[in-house]
Amino acid sequence: PLHYLALSEVLDEVEVIPVISTEGYGDFPGPEVLTLSGTKNPAELKDYIDSLYREEYYKGVVRDDVVDLVPDYMRPLIKERVVGKRVPEARKAVVELLRSLGKHDTIYEVLNGPIYCRCGTEIVVKVIRDQWYIDYDNPFWKSWTLKALDQIDVVPESSKRDLARAIFSLKKRACSRTRGLGVKLPWDESQIIDSLSDSTIYMAFYTISHKLNYDPEKLNEEFWNYVMLGNGNPIDLSKSIGIPEDELKALREEFSYWYPLDSRHSGRDLVQNHLPYMIYNHLAIFGENLVPRRIVVNGFVRVGGKKMSKSFRNIYPLYKAIEEYGVDPVRLALTVSSELSEDTDFDTSSIKAITDQLRRMYDLAVNVSKLKSSGENGLPEKWLLSLIHYKVREVNDLMNSLDFRKAFNVILYEFYDIVRDYISMVNFPNKYTLKTVLNIWSRLISPGAPHIAEEIWSMFNEDLVSLQRYPSPEELQVDGQALVQLEYIRYLIEQVKALASLTNKQPEKLIIYVSNSDELGLLRAVLRGLKDRNNLRELSSAIGLREENLKTLLEKIQTLPSTLRDFITVYSIDEFKTIIDNLNFLMRKLDVDEIQVYRSDDSSAPDIKGKKNSTLPLMPGIVIL
């Protein structure tokens, strides 16, 4: 219909040859568009043409008389494969027939066009003759690249498979073009080097770019061969190009210091092109010893759960976010909203929540700075520093594995909760202990929130936190006994809260039954067996417990905090005494008026709701009243 309309505007008469028959339409539905062509509503004409195309494509069949339109030798094939067929099937048959006869040609069309350059110019597809290419399908080079990929740490691991598939599928690729900005191809100045060909190793240039204060004419091929490949003699090179020998050596040392790349971060859309080319080209130029050590594939930024797009009207410039919320909350919100390889959702509610949490941490630091007395230095202080030791270790491990989301969640929230628990435990908080913790916290959060880190650091120190080393767990000693006892108390609080939530009842009084300390040996035996990776049958036989009972015990053990599981095999605990010693803290934390504690083997103790005999080591029976 559209073609008919176009032809009718330039020709007096248009001969129409019907090919498709569509039920409900005449032999020539095209001329009907002339009736609508004068409409004042172009959308009406477009809707009609689109609906006609759809009807013909999905419901139309090829007419019987099309055989009269082809030469005699083709008529049997047309009658067999095309006549009476629906349009999609007939199209495929015609293409195959023309291909077999050598009578077909291919026209490439940009289906999602028009496409525009960043400068606003419409992009056109052009065939370039005598174009240079790089043969990424060379079998030796391809196998060498796949082998090198095995030695590269890829985050996430799934992207390594995607990279391998991309490398395996790469063919010859043009490395030059005839127009646009760029460097001319050295051996063919009619061509310009395509950016994707050489931009995959530009990181090597960054290593020395800040020191290249020389005339460009001096930076010849021998210069680059020495600086980046170590080829040649700096004495001879110095005489040849006029750059002092010590400066040449310094450039070579600078490059050698930074290369190979420790970590290459890139968007996941570049897994199919830039990143595999980078590995290929690093191998070809520098050899396998200087390929990147790690490749990290990032996701994209989304706003309100949607991809940033002008059509969605949700473009949120970074400067606007910083002006509204500040640098630290924006950085942390983008970091903790998703895993590194996933899309990051820019959510204003998340930013506000992080802002509130930073303010809470700041207020806490202010209160600590105002403390007059050092306070006590007992079990709670030892527990606090011991637990912070493990949190620092956890954060370091997460940072090293690039799991920034979990790392900053630990720093932001778990640290704060731990400090609040400590303050609730004691009558007079120890200022020195809290200062130690806040100094560690400032250094931990500094990469994500440098401004708040400096503010809190300055409350207790004269210099800058940005000049300090990142915290190490070795800075703090561990008191296993204190850690076991107070982690048990915190675990007990969690269990009571979970039970209260399950029963939908706010407790006023608690009855707690604890296991006999002698039964702790059973739990230790199970935990040691798990560390030794014994299977269920071996473990059951070793400790003399039926497999069904062992399964139940293992399920309950998994609910214990990791610190308890790790240290209970070394340190003992008297659950009864530990609870009694921390009754005030428990009552404040759980907001109850009374707590009664009994040993499960105490014959004089009442059995409330059958909980007396339900205890296991570190897993008390709890009654809410």
Where are these regions (language model features)?
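Core structural elements
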Residues: 122, 170-177, 356-364, 381-393, ...
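A glycine-rich phosphate-binding loop feature that marks nucleotide/adenosyl-phosphate handling sites
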Residues: 110-121, 183, 187-190, 294-301, ...
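Alpha-helical recognition segments enriched in aromatics with Gly/Pro capping
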Residues: 1, 10-11, 17-23, 164-342
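C-terminal low-complexity, glycine/proline- and small-hydrophobic-enriched intrinsically disordered tails
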Residues: 348, 352, 464-625
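Charged, glycine/proline-rich intrinsically disordered loops and linkers
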Residues: 38-81, 214-252, 530-573
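Acidic, turn-prone loop/beta-hairpin segments
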Residues: 374-396, 409-413, 417-494
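Structured, non-catalytic alpha/beta "coupling" segments that mediate domain-domain communication
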Residues: 96-136, 351-365, 442-459, 592, ...
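Residue patterns forming the tRNA-binding/recognition surfaces of aminoacyl-tRNA synthetases
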Residues: 1-189, 199, 317, 321-350, ...
